Amino acid sequence: SDTMVSIIMLVHGAYEYTKNTIETLQMTKGNYELIVLDNDSDCKTKKLLLKLFNKGMIDKLVFSKTNTLFAKGNNIAFKLCSDKSDKVLLLNSDIDIRNPYWLQEMLENYEKGILSLGVCEKPPYVRVDGYCFLIDKKLYEKYRLDENFEWWWSITKLQAQVLNEGYKVKGVKDHSNLLFHYGGASGNDFQNSKGMQTDDKDIIKWFNEKNIDIIDKIDNDNYIFNSKSKANRIYNKLKGR
């Protein structure tokens, strides 16, 4: 498809994971641009981003003097989206792309609204994850991420708003054949961030009894996995493998 996707990635340190995400992203088939917003990383990570930008691996690069966290950071980066794109994909910087067709598979399974890799079934409500989150650009523009919820509840609220407008929100449960999310690589700044103490009852109310659709798995066996990459070695060491 000729659909152009604006991929937005926030970076806060985590040098090896960030490097791995952007380098493995290069195998992606399809029409996309990569917009990176650096949330006040260390010098080493900033230099890496400049190097990857100069190599053409990053299309648009912004350095923030403070850590804008998740909601505000994505909203700032969104303003840089090309006029040509009609979808936005929020992608974490601790990802291992493991299939060149991951983006095309997402586009093929997408219906107007949201398609996300990863489902969170923990209380208070079954919802999609936010580390690989594809959304209609006009819907993102309409709602943005609510900056009163600086971290993940902003993604939860956005999907509830999209569901309440009558659009689809779909989550792919097993996406291990497409990409892997390492998780927790950018530190603990989220713990004291605004909106983290949101009451479960409020979150349930957002959804208005509307539910996401769950896709068990998207079949595609063009799987490419480099177990020896530095990021995979670091991850396995942390997990004691």
Give, region by region, the residue ranges found by the protein language model.
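Short beta-strand/loop segment that forms part of the nucleotide-sugar
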Residues: 32-41, 62-64
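Short, acidic, metal-binding catalytic loop of nucleotide-sugar glycosyltransferases
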Residues: 23-32
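N-proximal low-complexity "stem/linker" segments adjacent to membrane-targeting elements
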Residues: 1-24
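A short, conserved acidic/glycine-rich loop-to-beta-strand motif
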Residues: 112-121
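Short beta-strand-to-loop acidic/aromatic patch adjacent to the donor-nucleotide binding site
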Residues: 85-96
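A conserved acidic beta->alpha catalytic loop
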Residues: 38-47, 96
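C-terminal catalytic/acceptor-binding lobe
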Residues: 149-152, 156-241
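Glycine-rich, basic loop-to-helix element that forms the pyrophosphate-binding segment
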Residues: 64-81
